UniProtKB/Swiss-Prot annotation:
The protein's name: Large ribosomal subunit protein uL11
Organism: Blochmanniella pennsylvanica (strain BPEN)
Disulfide bonds: none
Cited CDD domains: Ribosomal_L11 (cd00349)
Source organism phylogeny: Bacteria, Pseudomonadati, Pseudomonadota, Gammaproteobacteria, Enterobacterales
Pfam family of the protein (one): Ribosomal_L11_N
Reported function: Forms part of the ribosomal stalk which helps the ribosome interact with GTP-bound translation factors.
GO cellular component term, pick one: cytosolic large ribosomal subunit
Protein family: Belongs to the universal ribosomal protein uL11 family.
Length: 143
C-alpha cells in the first residue's frame, strides 16, 4: 500500500444527512481542491442512520492527490444533553437559573455514546465531564 502525503486536515460540524456544497463546506473543501459533491454524497450516506439535523463533528483528511478521507465523531455533549432534557437552549445564568432536569441514568447513556470518541477515559470520568457540561448549560442533575 502506498502511503499518501497529507495536504491538510479540515474540521467541520455538519448536520447529519444534510451536507451540501454551500458554506461552510464548499469553501473549506474547494480551497483544498477536493471534489465537494463527492464528499457531500459520502458524508450523507455515512450519516443516513442518524437523526437528520443532528450536528456531527467531522475531520476531513485531504491528501496531495486531492483525494480525501473523513472520520465522523459523536455529537457534542451539550446537544445530547439538551435533547435528553427536551430543551431548546441553555440557561443565560447557569448557576442561578435551572432550565431543566436530567437523571444520572441519562448522563450514563450520554457517557456511553461519548466514550467512542474519548479513548483512554473510563465511563465514570466521562460521566463527571458530562455532569459539568450539564451544569454549565443550566441543567440540574438528579440521582
Amino acid at each position: 500500500m502506498v502511503i499518501k502525503k497529507i495536504k491538510a486536515y479540515i474540521k467541520l460540524q455538519i448536520s447529519a444527512g444534510a451536507a451540501n456544497p454551500s458554506p461552510p463546506i464548499g469553501p473549506a473543501l474547494g480551497q483544498q481542491g477536493v471534489n465537494i459533491i463527492e464528499f457531500c454524497k459520502a458524508f450523507n450516506e455515512n450519516t443516513a442512520q442518524l437523526e437528520t439535523g443532528l450536528p456531527i463533528p467531522v475531520v476531513i483528511t485531504v491528501y496531495s492527490d486531492r483525494s480525501f478521507s473523513f472520520i465522523t465523531k459523536t455529537p457534542p455533549a451539550s446537544i445530547l444533553l439538551k435533547k435528553a432534557a427536551n430543551i431548546q437552549s441553555g440557561s443565560e445564568k447557569p448557576n442561578i437559573i435551572n432550565v431543566g432536569k436530567i437523571s444520572s441514568a441519562q448522563i450514563y447513556e450520554i457517557a456511553k455514546i461519548k466514550a467512542v470518541d474519548m479513548t483512554g477515559a473510563n465511563i465514570e470520568s466521562i460521566s463527571r465531564s458530562i455532569i459539568g457540561t450539564a451544569r454549565s448549560i443550566g441543567l440540574k442533575v438528579e440521582d
